From Swiss-Prot:
Gene from which the chain derives: prsA
One Gene Ontology term of the molecular function aspect: peptidyl-prolyl cis-trans isomerase activity
Record PROSITE patterns: PPIC_PPIASE_1, PPIC_PPIASE_2, PROKAR_LIPOPROTEIN
Record's keyword terms, sorted: Cell membrane, Isomerase, Lipoprotein, Membrane, Palmitate, Rotamase, Signal
GO cellular component: membrane raft; plasma membrane
Organism the protein comes from: Bacillus subtilis (strain 168)
Protein name: Foldase protein PrsA
Result of changing F163Y: No effect on secretion of proteins and on growth
InterPro entries named in the record: Foldase_PrsA, PPIase_dom_sf, PPIase_PpiC, PPIase_PpiC_CS, PrsA_foldase, Trigger_fac_C_sf, Trigger_fact/SurA_dom_sf
Low complexity biased stretches: 276-292
Length: 292
């Protein structure tokens, strides 16, 4: 959810930099103390945001040459963000335009593909993750506001409609875009107590009756419990990779592996060291963002 909002902040810097040039003396603000020119704005914008903007523009060109992102992938990601962000997404689209958000999502997807190509998942990583699943289950849910809607969903499930499809159609939870999947969780401390008790009573594959909590009415499906390591290894490898893809520092490190193979030469003397320091600065800023 944060990524598209961060992209919008980057948008402000890129649009401002592209709107003026260092040699432009056109006055854009007048005061009793003196005027401010486009050139002064450009110089100051370059000092504060030039390196990060240049990094994104160059990375996108390099990654776009090596990896391909389809229009369908972009549209699906935008739909996911729209579901997650709601009114915030509408505000971003109104402020920056759909085309710009598409471009930012394309950059994000290119980055993910580079990360998948360069991030390694070891057997030790998988074993550690498997050990951490002890006592946990995996479940999905459909959250609705009232009992009547819950009963309507329940009827459709009994008629054979897919749980995942109904979650996407009816659920008001952010997990809707993932078919209601909540991932793995323990019996205590992670979920609403009433919800957790109902989920842990289910057999794998079983669907609950509507369960009322402070959030509304849930229909819960237990999808998995921890099995033997060898039986789960392939599936868990994908889950561990997904976790690593959500680690911005790991993603930036993976992207830098691609960038190091590109023949990058920065002509601007003020920005010539951008790609000597961008790896460190990006990782640091990403880690800071995650900790907030």
């Amino acid at each position: 959810m944060k990524k598209i909002a961060i992209a919008a902040i980057t948008a402000t810097s890129i649009l401002a930099l592209s709107a003026c040039s260092s040699g432009d003396k056109e006055v854009i603000a007048k005061t009793d103390a003196g005027d401010v020119t486009k050139g002064e704005l450009y110089t100051n914008m370059k000092k504060t945001a030039g390196a990060s903007v240049l990094t994104q523009l160059v990375q996108e060109k390099v990654l776009d040459k090596k990896y391909k992102v389809s229009d369908k992938e972009i549209d699906n990601k935008l739909k996911e963000y729209k579901t997650q962000l709601g009114d915030q997404y509408t505000a971003l689209e109104k402020q920056y335009g759909k085309d710009y958000l598409k471009e930012q999502v394309k950059y994000e997807l290119l980055t993910q593909k580079a990360a998948k190509d360069n991030i390694k998942v070891t057997d030790a990583d998988i074993k550690e993750y498997w050990e951490g699943l002890k006592g946990k289950i995996r479940a999905s849910h459909i959250l609705v506001a009232d009992k009547k809607t819950a009963e309507e969903v329940e009827k459709k499930l009994k008629k054979g409609e897919k749980f995942e499809d109904l979650a996407k159609e009816y659920s008001t939870d952010s997990s809707a875009s993932k078919g209601g999947d909540l991932g793995w969780f323990a019996k205590e401390g992670q979920m609403d107590e009433t919800f957790s008790k109902a989920a842990f009573k289910l057999k794998t594959g079983e669907v609950s009756d509507p369960v009322k909590t402070q959030y509304g009415y849930h229909i819960i499906k237990k999808t998995e419990e921890r099995g033997k390591y060898d039986d789960m290894k392939k599936e868990l490898k994908s889950e561990v990779l997904e976790q690593k893809l959500n680690d911005n520092a790991a993603v930036q490190e993976a992207v830098q592996k691609v960038m190091k193979k590109a023949d990058i030469e920065v002509k601007d003397k003020d920005l010539k060291d951008t790609f000597n320091t961008s790896s460190t600065s990006n990782s640091t800023s990403s880690s800071s963002s995650n900790s907030k």
